[in-house]
């Protein structure tokens, strides 16, 4: 579990498939949040 915290400090230093998947998942969440924020403003 600590590996997740370590990867958070170095998001660009990831080469593992699992870590890469986590990053993509995080990016997806951010995109969804952005869309929700834009929708709320509109």
From Swiss-Prot:
Species of the source: Vaccinia virus (strain L-IVP) (VACV)
Family per record: Belongs to the orthopoxvirus OPG062 family.
One BP term from GO: viral protein processing
Annotated protein name in UniProt: Truncated phosphoprotein OPG062
GO terms assigned for molecular function: DNA binding
Entry-linked InterPro entries: Phosphoprotein_F17
One Pfam family in the UniProt entry: Pox_F17
Keywords per UniProt: DNA-binding, Late protein, Phosphoprotein
């Amino acid at each position: 579990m600590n590996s997740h915290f370590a990867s958070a400090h170095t998001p660009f230093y990831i080469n593992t498939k699992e870590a890469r998947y986590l990053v993509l998942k995080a990016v997806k969440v951010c995109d969804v949040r952005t869309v929700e924020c834009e929708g709320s403003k509109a």
